[in-house]
């Protein structure tokens, strides 16, 4: 019994082990099915055929479990699916799930494309542009990747990283930095002049199981599922620092690295500073770059040095976390970690650690140098790849030109997208360009080889028709080119075989710079951007060339055989000579800049591609009729940015207007589409016309809403297309300022006007329309002309297709008819069309994804002559559509009401980060670094979860650990539950940030408020010395300091007394008076004190007394001088009078004679005599006396005067009269003055 127990236990253990193994095998077998799509084994294990099958299955099961674990963690950031509302139907729920899935796939594809190929985050406009293209089905995920891989920015990034490899001192190529070689076969029977373009190439990051197994095996052009290795960090990290050495004086010898002083100081500095870096992981070495003199003072030396770290050595602790987030598109806070993991994780504490270590070594006496820890600055951190060996590729076909694998990178990428089917039509672009974006550090051999490969033409024996797109750009980059508005491309004969294009970098410049023909000289032909998505022109679309003698100018790099074929077969199509002659003067000089934006090289396509399995449909060359007016207005900014965003779809057809229709078949189909419960009508039109179009057309129709028209050719079986989603936007979306869901119906009433005859151009362009692939075009609001054809008896909408390749303006003339009111139906023969204006409800919940809408922007010229003409421009500007509310009544739209963008404020608190005073300064490095970190964390998360997200702005950081105040702007209005949605998203972000990024965010500190309800001052870091002011127009809040306080470098407001210690001089006390500002309280002594605004004036008591006495004395002196001067003047007058009078002996007779003379009759003084009589009468009644003496008159006594008169011959009455006059003269001063006045007049 005792022996049986151990045996039983062993048997039971074997049984359990067997059952467990069986379950593992069955689980691996069940999970083996999805592993065919994507392999999770490493390339070494997947290609190792020596491993047993059972062991590989176990490894598959283990790796699958790990991947599923990561995918389950991924759900932390995104919710699983779309929430189902109780009011939704099954169809609506399914449609919402499909929309949600499509938006998620597009979002992740866009993020991965930007991160993989351009190594950066997409901008708002870029993200919106690619989301529209992806959601509308215009481009697929793989086509998007092909476009990004062939972009100029991607190639510049590759060249930049290749240039970094030449900076490393000594290292060898590794698998992580240099990719395996890929070989591409040359088609059988092809005579190629492409010098080694398809021999071999090396490209980082590309891997294939077939190439790893057998390097000599050819790889087909079919797209295969390849397991991509995770991107490894840079081989080396180089961090550049700058620090100041105190106690040293800079000399000119330190400029020369060969001087003894320079070498001595370098050795001393490295030996001392190296101690601070030895403890860091991955440290390799340090080198001094230069010594500089300090800018502020003369003492000290600024040392610029670089420290090298091993990127692989430090990945032990950080690479695991990076790999955890490698599959998470939304975690773009680690976007730079692929190249600089050390910088990202240690940049906030790196400077403090080094400065503290250096300072401690100096204090402990271990260092002879005295570095200033405050002057330590981290200038730059960059990753350096290991150098790779260049494999020289020799041409074995027809040339001895040797090139490197990096110079033919574009050709190898281009070859990947060529179809393996030999019957597929090949698209070829002859690119006569010469612009090369190679690295400045490239060698001369590489530059020579790249310039030699500018233009490569090869002949291929393919039976399928081909298409050649002519392109040209100016000779000098940034120069100006003559742009022909009406594109007139040359067409090759269908039998001319051409091969795929070969380009070394983005763009090229033709040495001649222009392509000339016999009719159009000194003009250039705007070419379509080179892309593998360009669709071919079939054989039957090429008109017969009877007299085609025009030759294409050859380039030095074209082969002679290709030049001869092009000379024979390229010419101007027949029937376009008149058009070319008419528009020869309509040229516009515009500047050209290199294509660096996303939209530059992208071209719409109709779903054709390598391995797509579709029949090859054809897009005909677009043509447009142009007027004779000369346009010299430069293109607008929005036009220059998006001119290459769409395929030119200019209508090459003859439109029938004024009812002159010979044979017209027009079918209008309106399909109703429902978004929720809101129907939106779309119009599709198929037309086949065989007439001409008058260029000038009269129209009195007001601007209408944008429509969509589908131009197709006349085919035997007319198919009706049913749309599930508009390619660009609904007809009109009206969103009122309120959030209530309303439906507005705009009825367009046609205005009846009589057709008037105007002079039309005699030149008509005959055009034949073969089979055409449907292409969607969007028209501006004013590009719609309503007509009614009498033969058909139904309304039709004739539209002119617009193209960004031309700026010609057409004047359309049409007779307007009044339509009778009938019940609105969706039948194609309705006479009154109703455009239903549906309110787009933009949900910002986690499960909703919105759509951005665009409309064409009309300039002032396009609205000109609205009374008799409607100007239509063939330029379509796709800009952001403003949110408008349209009136419900018919007629001309009176006005539009624009709704402002929604603003949401929120704040959160990070508890495991310490606040510093530098975070108050928005210009400090610490503030910018922290701001950039939060933007990289929050922007991708919010943009992927919120529809209509526009941008995020960090307003401020406040103390309290770290409180982040932010503001989010939305492009469109949002429902009232935006606060709740934002709160949920931020709450999930807090959880995710704590689990993945070691950020402890307090959930209870989350504060979310919408802009119309929130107080902007709440999210401003205004302290107690400032007040928050809100701009009533913009709603922006700003902190304004109180009087006496000042903000320096955007720091919180501080007192002037603290900011300016010398504000008060002479020991004055600075004080802040509320409402007045800073004042100085000056010192006061016993007999002295200071005064002035800053106490700058000294005053003492003796000095004041002296000044007072001096002032009094001065006043007295001045008064005395004035009195003395007046006395002198009076004395001088008396002296003059005395001199004028006679001597005393003759004084009496003169006095009497003067009185007598005064009494003589003078006719001029009769009035005075009458006055004298009145005096005599008054004085005759009163006795006369003299105040001096009664007996003395004029110095003589009364008796003496009487004796004098008696001795004369005067009568008694005369004597008596004269005596009275004398008495009056002596007693009355007024009379005396009167007498003296007349006496002076007589003299």
Curated annotation (Swiss-Prot):
Disulfide bonds join 1017-1028, 1022-1039, 1041-1053, 1057-1070, 1064-1080, 1082-1095. Expressed in the retina (at protein level). Expressed in the pineal gland. One of its GO terms (cellular component) is receptor complex. It is a single-pass type I membrane protein. Residues 1128-1136 are annotated as: Hyaluronan-binding motif involved in chondroitin sulfate A- and C-binding. Residues 1013-1054, 1055-1096 form the EGF-like domain. Residues 1128-1243 are cytoplasmic. Residues 748-762 have a biased composition (Basic and acidic residues). SUPFAM superfamilies: SEA domain. The gene is Impg2. Residues 207-220 have a biased composition (Low complexity). Chondroitin sulfate- and hyaluronan-binding proteoglycan involved in the organization of interphotoreceptor matrix; may participate in the maturation and maintenance of the light-sensitive photoreceptor outer segment. Binds heparin. Residues 1083-1091, 1139-1147 are annotated as: Hyaluronan-binding motif involved in chondroitin sulfate C-binding. It comes from Mus musculus (Mouse). Residues 255-263 are annotated as: Hyaluronan-binding motif involved in chondroitin sulfate A-binding. It is found in: Photoreceptor outer segment membrane; Photoreceptor inner segment membrane; Secreted, Extracellular space, Extracellular matrix, Interphotoreceptor matrix. Changing residue 263 to H: Decreased-binding affinity to hyaluronan. Residues 28-1106 are extracellular. This is Interphotoreceptor matrix proteoglycan 2. Residues 235-349, 900-1013 form the SEA domain. The chain crosses the membrane at residues 1107-1127. Keywords: Cell projection, Disulfide bond, EGF-like domain, Extracellular matrix, Glycoprotein, Heparin-binding, Membrane, Receptor, Repeat, Secreted, Signal, Transmembrane, Transmembrane helix. The lineage of its organism: Eukaryota, Metazoa, Chordata, Craniata, Vertebrata. Residues 1212-1220 are annotated as: Hyaluronan-binding motif involved in chondroitin sulfate A- and C-binding motif. Residues 1-27 form the signal peptide. InterPro entries: EGF-like_dom (IPR000742), IMPG (IPR039861), SEA_dom (IPR000082), SEA_dom_sf (IPR036364). Residues 205-234, 748-768 are annotated as: Disordered. It comes from the Eukaryota. Glycans are attached at residues 225, 297, 316, 366, 427-429, 582, 701, 704, 712, 817, 888, 945, 959.
């Amino acid at each position: 019994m005792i022996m049986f127990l151990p045996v039983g236990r062993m048997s039971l253990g074997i049984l359990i082990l067997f059952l467990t193994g069986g379950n593992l095998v069955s689980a691996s077998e069940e999970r083996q099915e999805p592993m065919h799509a994507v392999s999770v084994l490493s390339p070494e294990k997947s290609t190792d055929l020596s491993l047993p099958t059972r062991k590989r299955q176990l490894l598959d099961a283990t790796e699958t479990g790990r991947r599923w674990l990561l995918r389950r963690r991924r759900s932390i950031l995104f919710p699983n699916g779309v929430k189902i509302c109780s009011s939704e139907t099954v169809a609506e729920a399914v449609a919402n799930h499909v929309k949600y899935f499509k938006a998620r796939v597009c979002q992740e594809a866009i993020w991965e494309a930007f991160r993989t190929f351009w190594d950066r985050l997409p901008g708002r406009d870029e993200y919106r542009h690619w989301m529209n293209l992806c959601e509308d089905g215009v481009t697929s995920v793989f086509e998007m990747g092909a476009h990004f891989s062939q972009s100029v920015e991607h190639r510049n990034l590759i060249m930049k990283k290749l240039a970094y490899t030449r900076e490393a001192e000594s290292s060898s190529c590794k698998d992580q930095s240099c990719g395996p070689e890929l070989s591409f076969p040359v088609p059988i029977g092809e005579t190629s002049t492409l010098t080694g373009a398809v021999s071999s190439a090396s490209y980082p990051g590309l891997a294939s199981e077939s190439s790893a197994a057998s390097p000599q095996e050819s790889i087909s052009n079919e797209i295969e599922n390849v397991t991509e290795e995770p991107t490894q960090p840079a081989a080396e990290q180089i961090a550049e620092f700058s620090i100041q050495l105190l106690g040293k004086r800079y000399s000119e010898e330190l400029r020369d690295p060969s001087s003894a002083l320079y070498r001595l100081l370098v050795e001393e500095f490295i030996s001392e500073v190296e101690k601070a870096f030895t403890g860091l992981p991955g440290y390799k070495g340090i080198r001094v770059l230069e010594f500089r003199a300090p800018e502020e003072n003369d003492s000290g030396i600024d040392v610029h040095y670089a420290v090298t770290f091993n990127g692989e050595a430090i990945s032990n602790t950080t690479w695991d976390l990076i790999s955890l987030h490698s599959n998470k598109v939304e975690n773009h806070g680690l976007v730079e970690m692929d190249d600089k993991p050390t910088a990202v994780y240690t940049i906030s504490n790196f400077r403090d650690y080094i400065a503290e270590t250096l300072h401690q070594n100096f204090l402990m006496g271990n260092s002879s140098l005295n570095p200033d820890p405050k002057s330590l600055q981290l200038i730059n951190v960059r990753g350096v790849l290991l150098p790779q060996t260049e494999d020289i590729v020799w041409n074995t076909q027809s040339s001895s030109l040797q090139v490197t694998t990096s110079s033919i990178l574009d050709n190898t990428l281009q070859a990947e997208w060529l179809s393996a089917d030999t019957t597929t039509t090949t698209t070829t672009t002859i690119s006569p360009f010469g612009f090369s974006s190679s690295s400045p550090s490239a060698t001369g051999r590489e530059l020579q080889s790249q310039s030699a490969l500018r233009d490569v033409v090869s002949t291929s024996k393919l039976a399928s028709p081909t298409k050649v797109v002519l392109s040209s750009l100016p000779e000098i980059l940034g120069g100006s080119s003559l742009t022909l508005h009406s594109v007139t491309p040359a067409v090759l004969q269908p039998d001319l075989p051409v091969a795929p294009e070969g380009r070394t970098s983005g763009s090229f410049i033709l040495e001649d710079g222009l392509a000339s023909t016999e009719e159009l000289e000194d003009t250039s032909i705007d070419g379509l951007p080179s892309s593998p998505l360009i669709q071919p022109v079939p054989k039957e679309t090429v008109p017969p060339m009877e007299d085609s003698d025009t030759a294409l100018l050859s380039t030095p790099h074209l082969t002679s055989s290709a030049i001869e074929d092009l000379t024979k077969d390229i010419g101007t199509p027949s029937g376009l000579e008149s058009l070319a002659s008419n528009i020869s003067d309509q040229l516009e000089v515009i500047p050209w800049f290199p294509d660096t934006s996303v939209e530059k090289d992208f071209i719409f396509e109709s779903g054709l591609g390598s391995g797509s399995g579709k029949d090859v449909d054809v897009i005909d060359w677009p043509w447009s009729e142009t007027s004779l007016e000369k346009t010299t207005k430069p293109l607008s900014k929005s036009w220059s940015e998006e001119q290459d965003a769409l395929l030119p779809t200019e209508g090459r057809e003859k439109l029938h207007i004024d009812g002159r229709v010979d044979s017209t078949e027009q079918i209008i189909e309106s399909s109703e589409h429902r978004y929720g419960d809101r129907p939106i009508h779309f119009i599709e039109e198929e037309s086949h016309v065989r007439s001409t179009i008058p260029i000038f057309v009269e129209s009195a129709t007001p601007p209408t809403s944008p429509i969509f028209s589908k131009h197709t050719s006349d085919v035997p079986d007319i198919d009706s297309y049913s749309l599930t989603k508009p390619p660009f936007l609904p007809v009109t979306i009206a969103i009122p300022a309120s959030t209530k869901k309303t439906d507005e119906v705009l009825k367009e009433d046609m205005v009846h006007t009589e057709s008037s005859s105007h002079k039309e151009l005699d030149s008509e362009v005959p055009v034949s329309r073969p089979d055409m692939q449907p292409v969607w075009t969007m028209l501006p609001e004013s590009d719609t002309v309503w007509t009614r054809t009498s033969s058909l008896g139904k309304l039709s909408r004739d539209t002119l297709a617009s193209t960004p390749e031309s700026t010609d303006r057409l004047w359309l003339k049409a007779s307007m008819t009044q339509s009778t009111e009938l019940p609105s139906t969706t039948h194609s023969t309705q006479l009154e069309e109703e455009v239903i204006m549906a309110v787009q409800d933009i949900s910002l919940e986690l499960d909703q994804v919105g759509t951005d809408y665009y409309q064409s922007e009309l300039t002032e010229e396009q609205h000109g002559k609205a009374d008799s003409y409607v100007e239509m421009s063939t330029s379509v500007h796709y800009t952001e559509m403003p949110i408008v509310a349209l009136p419900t009544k018919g007629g001309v739209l009176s006005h539009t009401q624009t709704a402002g963008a929604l603003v949401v404020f929120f704040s959160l608190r990070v508890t495991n980060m310490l606040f510093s005073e530098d975070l108050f300064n928005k210009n400090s490095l610490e503030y910018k670094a922290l701001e950039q970190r939060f933007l990289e964390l929050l922007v991708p998360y919010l943009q992927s979860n919120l529809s209509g997200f526009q941008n995020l702005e960090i307003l401020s950081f406040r103390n309290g650990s770290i409180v982040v105040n932010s503001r989010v702007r939305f492009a469109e209005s949002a429902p009232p539950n935006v606060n709740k949605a934002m709160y949920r998203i931020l709450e999930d972000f807090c959880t995710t940030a704590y689990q993945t990024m070691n950020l402890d965010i307090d959930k209870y500190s989350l504060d979310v408020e919408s802009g119309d309800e929130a107080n902007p001052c709440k999210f401003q870091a205004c302290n107690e010395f400032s007040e928050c002011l809100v701009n009533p127009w913009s709603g922006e809040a700003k902190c304004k300091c109180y009087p006496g306080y000042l903000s320096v470098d955007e720091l919180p407001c501080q007192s002037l007394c603290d900011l300016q210690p010398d504000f008060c001089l002479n020991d004055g006390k600075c004080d802040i008076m509320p409402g007045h500002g800073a004042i100085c309280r000056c010192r006061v002594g016993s007999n002295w004190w200071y005064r002035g605004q800053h106490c700058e004036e000294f005053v003492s008591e003796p000095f004041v007394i002296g000044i007072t006495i001096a002032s009094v004395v001065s006043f007295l002196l001045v008064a005395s001088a004035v009195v003395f001067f007046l006395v002198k003047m009076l004395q001088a007058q008396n002296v003059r009078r005395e001199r004028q009078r006679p001597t005393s002996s003759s004084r009496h007779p003169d006095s009497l004679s003067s009185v007598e003379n005064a009494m003589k009759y003078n006719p001029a003084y009769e009035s005075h005599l009458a006055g004298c009589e009145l005096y005599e009468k008054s004085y005759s009644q009163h006795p006369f006396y003299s105040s001096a003496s009664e007996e003395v008159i004029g110095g003589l006594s009364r008796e003496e005067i009487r004796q004098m008169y008696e001795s004369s011959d005067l009568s008694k009455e005369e004597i008596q009269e004269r005596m009275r006059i004398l008495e009056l003269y002596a007693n009355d001063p007024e009379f005396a003055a009167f007498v003296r006045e007349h006496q002076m007049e007589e003299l």
